[in-house]
Amino acid sequence: MTPEHLPTEQYEAQLAEKVARLQSMMAPFSDLVPEVFRSPVSHYRMRAEFRLWHDGDDLYHIMFDQQTKSRIRVDTFPAASQLINTLMKAMIAGVRDNHALRHKLFQMDYLTTLSNQAVVSLLYHKKLDEEWREAATALRDALRAQGLNVHLIGRATKTKIELDQDYIDERLPVAGKEMIYRQVENSFTQPNAAMNIQMLEWALEVTKDSKGDLLELYCGNGNFSLALARNFNRVLATEIAKPSVAAAQYNIAANHIDNVQIIRMAAEEFTLAMNGVREFNRLQGIDLKGYQCETIFVDPPRSGLDSETEKMVQAYPRILYISCNPETLCKNLETLSQTHTVSRLALFDQFPYTHHMECGVLLTAR
């Protein structure tokens, strides 16, 4: 695979290899055949980052070969959304001959939605001034005149200039209901929107007969919490990143959801609070003992669950675990399988044509 060529003819084979690999990895814990959710074969990534290469008068996006570290010119990127591809051409055309925008520009980050909104961040090794702001505003207006719903952001050391806003609002159809998700530039969002919809619908389906409340650790912008709220009496969710918490609060209001509470704290801190080891000012006014959480949802970073959180989640009758790294999932399952059994297993092809796998397991207490 190269940035400008996707081996779409190999999609089925690469997916079959992942299914076999996941089944083999999970064999010590389950004999279930994974439920498989396919990605679109192209234009599936909603975000992308590129370095910029200044080659005389020419200017173009580049990526680096992971093995050789050599640079690769990228004029089109079929893994990314159609909107990103359109913007790549338009941004180069708008910046190439404009000194204020081009000088010391080293990277562009693109974030797009299925609802055809975009944020493009321009990263610089220089101080950004009023001349830059005026040039960027003119470029933004020119892009909008072409029918592109785009926001531009300038970034430099200790500097961030928003011409109007640093977010876009995604709209996803999830099990017959449109969900609105505010996505903030430079914060985590699901990269493959089509796969995100399938993950949300799978999570809804496996929790459809739930009793009691849901606890979620690492909730981000509320991606799963808000979609799953319809299956539970109440949802209590934790997140540490300020922009994500703010986006989650907006998303609660935008989706008219009244049974979700977001707490800004790390999963490790929350574990201490739940176990009564420490009290936190941030939890004043929240009656943790009043929640009857029979299901816990975790979508941890690639490192998986730490040992204290492993112990904490074992106290819940059901654990819904979305993993972006099956190796650390299996490491966690060495502990979790002592108290729980795997009752559902899914493979989500979030990153086609790469070694990476995303998977989901539902664990029920023995």
From Swiss-Prot:
S-adenosyl-L-methionine binds at Q190, Y218, N223, E239, D299. Keywords: Methyltransferase, S-adenosyl-L-methionine, Transferase, tRNA processing. GO terms for molecular function: rRNA binding; tRNA (uracil(54)-C5)-methyltransferase activity, S-adenosyl methionine-dependent; tRNA binding. Its EC number is 2.1.1.-, 2.1.1.35. GO terms for cellular component: cytosol. HAMAP family: RNA_methyltr_TrmA. It comes from Salmonella newport (strain SL254). It comes from the Bacteria. It catalyses: uridine(54) in tRNA + S-adenosyl-L-methionine = 5-methyluridine(54) in tRNA + S-adenosyl-L-homocysteine + H(+); uridine(341) in tmRNA + S-adenosyl-L-methionine = 5-methyluridine(341) in tmRNA + S-adenosyl-L-homocysteine + H(+). It is an enzyme of class 2 (transferase). PROSITE patterns: SAM_MT_RNA_M5U, TRMA_1, TRMA_2. Belongs to the class I-like SAM-binding methyltransferase superfamily. RNA M5U methyltransferase family. TrmA subfamily. One of its GO terms (biological process) is tRNA methylation. This is tRNA/tmRNA (uracil-C(5))-methyltransferase. SUPFAM superfamilies: S-adenosyl-L-methionine-dependent methyltransferases. It holds the Pfam family tRNA_U5-meth_tr. InterPro entries: MeTrfase_TrmA_AS, MeTrfase_TrmA_CS, SAM-dependent_MTases_sf, TrmA_MeTrfase, U5_MeTrfase_fam. Dual-specificity methyltransferase that catalyzes the formation of 5-methyluridine at position 54 (m5U54) in all tRNAs, and that of position 341 (m5U341) in tmRNA (transfer-mRNA).
